[in-house]
Regions:
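PRPP-associated nucleotide enzymes
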Residues: 1-172
């Protein structure tokens, strides 16, 4: 299953202009390409390295973010160190504003501090993991309840789960 459609619908409904979807590293290019396609947005990629565990360094942006609204998309936000560095890199490259989206908000350790330092307008996540107390105001949580309900109903009624996702439940 994927929350891609919940997240992209949310961003479509926001009506943001001049969007560029930004992959935080090479491992997320396919996900971000699909996300960008659903929004009719451009795609940019960050060159990220991890010199040590929980340490992210981003060298440069591949693609044009100048004057655009960037949406950084990942599957998980854990300590938010990658998100903080990615946001700063994209803003330094001239992005007008930065948003972020992820399915799973682990948000461990100093994640809330990293988010506060990231300069992100809004972080959109799903309710697959409850947020701990003190979550920043710029985090928006979307429900996966309908997606799960429809998937379970399809399984028990012997219908295709792929239909719940319009036949696009495979990202790769």
């Amino acid at each position: 299953m994927t929350a891609l459609f919940i997240l992209t619908q949310y961003f479509r409904d926001l009506g943001l202009q001049d969007l560029v979807v930004v992959a935080p590293d090479a491992g997320r290019v396919k996900l971000n390409k699909k996300f960008a396609s659903k929004l009719g947005a451009d795609l940019a990629i960050l060159d990220k390295e991890r010199p040590a565990q929980q340490v992210a360094e981003i060298g440069y942006v591949i693609g044009d973010v100048k004057g655009k609204t960037a949406v950084i998309v990942d599957d998980i936000i854990d300590t938010a160190s990658t998100l903080r560095v990615a946001s700063q890199t994209v803003l330094d490259a001239g992005a007008r504003a930065v948003y972020a989206a992820a399915t799973h908000p682990v948000l461990s350790g100093n994640a809330y501090e990293n988010i506060a330092d990231a300069g992100i307008e809004q972080i959109v996540v799903t309710d697959t993991i409850p947020l701990r107390a003190g979550a920043p105001d710029n985090i928006t949580v979307l429900s996966c309840a309908e997606l799960l309900t429809d998937s379970i109903r399809s399984i028990f009624s012997d219908r295709s789960v792929s239909d719940v996702f319009g036949g696009e439940n495979q990202l790769f």
